[in-house]
Amino acid sequence: MADITKDQVVEFISNMTVLELSEFITELEEKFGVSAAAPVAAVAAMPGAAGGEAAGGEEQTEFDVILKSAGGNKIAVIKAVRALTGLGLKEAKAKVDEAPAAIKEGVEKAEAEEALKQLEEAGAEAEMK
């Protein structure tokens, strides 16, 4: 194996565009037969499955904003996605085209609510998880 450090791998990945990173993740999922999204969905489903069993359950502190569809005004939604994520035009358009797609991940409730509001004002259908 080559003398590549973890820091070099992290640096390489941090320089990827969102589209390149998405393709990279897909390749890793296919190579290792796993899904990066499955554990998140399983963890999110667990508290609901427990019902009233967990009286001292933890309150969710990190939220994801998911774009479900662009709605009727795709251009406004692309502009909103660019403003929220800092992506370039091409990457933001790709993100909108591949909906449902995560726009914000692991953010605080207030930030997630604001992002959701901006997307909905632009005409998008979005949800907060």
Swiss-Prot record:
Which superkingdom does the taxonomy of this entry point to? Bacteria
Q: Does the keyword Ribonucleoprotein apply?
A: yes
Keyword hit for rRNA processing = no
Please give the biological process terms from Gene Ontology that the record holds. Answer: translation
Spell out the Pfam families in the cross-references.
Ribosomal_L12, Ribosomal_L12_N
- Report the GO terms under cellular component: cytosolic large ribosomal subunit
* Database matches in CDD domains: Ribosomal_L7_L12
* An annotated Gene Ontology molecular function: mRNA binding
What are the entry keywords? Answer: Ribonucleoprotein, Ribosomal protein
The subunit field of the Swiss-Prot or TrEMBL record says: Homodimer. Part of the ribosomal stalk of the 50S ribosomal subunit. Forms a multimeric L10(L12)X complex, where L10 forms an elongated spine to which 2 to 4 L12 dimers bind in a sequential fashion. Binds GTP-bound translation factors.
Q: What family classification does the UniProt entry report for this protein?
A: Belongs to the bacterial ribosomal protein bL12 family.
| Role noted for this protein | Forms part of the ribosomal stalk which helps the ribosome interact with GTP-bound translation factors. Is thus essential for accurate translation.
* PANTHER family found in the cross-reference section: 39S RIBOSOMAL PROTEIN L12, LARGE RIBOSOMAL SUBUNIT PROTEIN BL12M
Q: What name has this protein been given in UniProt?
A: Large ribosomal subunit protein bL12
Q: Which gene encodes it?
A: rplL
